[in-house]
C-alpha cells in the first residue's frame, strides 16, 4: 500500500492549505452535497481533472497478481498536485505527478521505490460548454531503478477533452511520451495512455465512475485496456473546499506484457481548494 512517508507528506500539504483556509473562514466543517443544479456542479467540479482549483490527489492502484508474477503483489501510489495559473493571457493547468511503487520482483518479496516525476502544462480553451486542453509533458528520471521508471528523460504531450452534463461528466485524457536522454542501458521507447472519464451523479454527492487508464508501451510490449466500475462521494465545505473519496475496481478486457494486471483496485482521496481566481464552469 502507500508508504507512510507519502501519507505523511500529503497530510502535511492538506493541513497547510486547510490551516490557511480556516484562518480566512473560521474553520467550518464539511457538509454533504445536496441535490439540484448546484450539487451537480459541485460533484462535477470535484471530479473534473482541470477544474481551476488547487488540487491534491492521494491515489493508489492495488494489483493482486501482475502478469508474469503469479501469486505476488504490485502496488502503486500516486501523489498529484495540480495548480491553475494564468500567464500570457492563457488559462493553464499545471500538474505534477510522483509515483511511489511497491513492485513484485523475481528475487522474492516486493520492493518500494519512487518512480519518474512527471509534469505537464495544459492550455485550456472553452468551446460550446466543452473544455479542451493541450500542452507539453516532461518526465525526469527520478526513479530508484528500472523496476520503477525508464532511467531516461522523457518528453511528449498531454491533452484533454471534457464536458459536464446534468447527469455527470464525460471526457478523455491522453498522454504520449518518448524517451530521449539519460542512462544508456535504460529502455528506449514510447508510452501512450488514454483515460476515458465517465461519471454519473446521484443525490447528496454520491456518484458512479469509470476511469480506467489504457496503456500502450512499445518497449515493454505492454498493452492494457482496463474497464472500471466504482463509486465515490463528494463533500463541500462552506468555504468552497471540496473533498472527494472513491474506490473503483478495474478489470482488463485486453492485456499483454509483463506486469499487465488482470484486475486491480483503484482508490483515492482528492482535495480541491479555491485559489482566489474566478471559477469558470466546465
Where are these regions (language model features)?
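Sec/Tat signal peptide C-region and signal peptidase I cleavage site
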Residues: 16-22
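Acidic, Pro/Ser/Gly/Ala-rich intrinsically disordered segments
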Residues: 2, 22-25
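Transmembrane beta-barrel domains of Gram-negative outer membranes and organellar outer membranes
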Residues: 24-282
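Bacterial N-terminal signal peptides
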Residues: 4-15
Amino acid at each position: 500500500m502507500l508508504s507512510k512517508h507519502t501519507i505523511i507528506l500529503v497530510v502535511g500539504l492538506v493541513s497547510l492549505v486547510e490551516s490557511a483556509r480556516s484562518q480566512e473562514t473560521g474553520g467550518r466543517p464539511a457538509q454533504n452535497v445536496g441535490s439540484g443544479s448546484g450539487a451537480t456542479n459541485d460533484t462535477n467540479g470535484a471530479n473534473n481533472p482541470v477544474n481551476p482549483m488547487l488540487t491534491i490527489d492521494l491515489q493508489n492502484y492495488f494489483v493482486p497478481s501482475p502478469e508474469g508474477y503469479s501469486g505476488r503483489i504490485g502496488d502503486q501510489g500516486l501523489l498529484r498536485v495540480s495548480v491553475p495559473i494564468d500567464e500570457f493571457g492563457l488559462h493553464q493547468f499545471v500538474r505534477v505527478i510522483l509515483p511511489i511503487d511497491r513492485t513484485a520482483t523475481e528475487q522474492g518479496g516486493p520492493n518500494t521505490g519512487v518512480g519518474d516525476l512527471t509534469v505537464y502544462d495544459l492550455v485550456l480553451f472553452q468551446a460550446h460548454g466543452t473544455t479542451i486542453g493541450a500542452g507539453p509533458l516532461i518526465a525526469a528520471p527520478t526513479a530508484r531503478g528500472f523496476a520503477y521508471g525508464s532511467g531516461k528523460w522523457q518528453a511528449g504531450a498531454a491533452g484533454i477533452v471534457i464536458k459536464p452534463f446534468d447527469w455527470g461528466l464525460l471526457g478523455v485524457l491522453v498522454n504520449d511520451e518518448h524517451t530521449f536522454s539519460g542512462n544508456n542501458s535504460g529502455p528506449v521507447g514510447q508510452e501512450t495512455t488514454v483515460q476515458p472519464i465517465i461519471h454519473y451523479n446521484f443525490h447528496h454527492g454520491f456518484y458512479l465512475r469509470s476511469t480506467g487508464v489504457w496503456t500502450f508501451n512499445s518497449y515493454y510490449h505492454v498493452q492494457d485496456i482496463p474497464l472500471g466500475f466504482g463509486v465515490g462521494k463528494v463533500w463541500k465545505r462552506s468555504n468552497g473546499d471540496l473533498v472527494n473519496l472513491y474506490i473503483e475496481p478495474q478489470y482488463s478486457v485486453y492485456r499483454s506484457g509483463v506486469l499487465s494486471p488482470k484486475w486491480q483496485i483503484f482508490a483515492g482521496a482528492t482535495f480541491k481548494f479555491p485559489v482566489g481566481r474566478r471559477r469558470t464552469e466546465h
